[in-house]
Amino acid sequence: HQQVVLGNAYLQDFFFPGYTAEFVAAWNKDDPSVHYDDNGFLVRPAPIGNVVNEGPGGGPLAHGIRVGYFGWLGSGHIRRVNLTHAFYQAVGEDTFNPVAGRRVTVNAQMAAAELSYDRDWIRYRISTFYTSGDANPRDGRARGFDSIVDLPNFAGGIFSFWNREAIRLLGSGVSLTTDGSLIPSLRSTKEEGQANFVNPGIFLANVGADFDITPKLKGFANVNYLRFERTEPLEFLLFESPIRHSIGEDFGIGVTYRPPLSENIVMTGGASALQPGAGFKDIYTARTLFSLFGSVKFTF
């Protein structure tokens, strides 16, 4: 179904010593197809909006992606301040976007940056994350950014409720967010579904800290403020207006423990919570959502 071509170029000591720049070009060609997951649910095309052609011949409508990504990423340090950043521009087309109900051209952006400072055994972090959103879900321009596939260790990573928990969109066959992603992409699944560039986008601000308690034990604390960049796609799909922009505050704590001081055994545990903002309350609930989790990974 899908073919991806990726090219990277790295430049060390770019601009200043200790900073490495990475320039990325990627091409995502995801052909139209019909696919059901192991539980028998339709995931390609995404079961939302216009899916079936009701004209002569019938059948699912062709939803194909032809999108190029161009990115500038970097990591390094300026004296004692650590810097990590990324910017992506996505351009191309979707042959038939189910939300827009038509062919759309893609023009979307993503930006992220993190500054951190090490003091003794603690690293203090501030970061921000942004993806553009679509202000008019039915026109011919798709401005909501979506990735090919992502698993960001950013803004709390797996210790963030928003990042870890897949949140289903009410009354639909898609998710507001998929597990392991910060982007409210409105796609069926990250692994089996297709990218969707008609989505609300997001703005995130983060503060946190990492604690090297012992060489084997590391702790994490994290607070995020989340906000939809646009809400028009949600208002259109849910037949509800207005939906406000604030998603809420996301709190997370956790630890990782490596008994043999290697990656052979990694034990992870934590707790996270999402305190809904006005926009999340408009869609779901005003109750605080909680998550407790733990895992053990063996690598040999």
Please name every model-derived segment:
Residues 1-142, 203-207, 212-213, 225-229, ...:
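Signature for the C-terminal beta-barrel architecture of outer-membrane proteins
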Residues 253, 287-300:
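Outer-membrane beta-barrel "beta-signal"
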Residues 246-276:
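C-terminal structured "cap/appendage" subdomains that terminate the fold
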Residues 179-235, 246, 251-253, 282:
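Exposed, low-structure sequence patches enriched in small/polar residues
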Residues 261, 281-286:
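Short proline/glycine-enriched turn/loop segments at secondary-structure junctions
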Residues 144-194, 198:
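Flexible glycine-rich, low-complexity coil/linker segments exposed to the extracellular/periplasmic environment
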Residues 51-58, 95-98, 185-193, 235-240, ...:
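Extracytoplasmic loops and strand-loop junctions of Gram-negative outer membrane beta-barrel proteins
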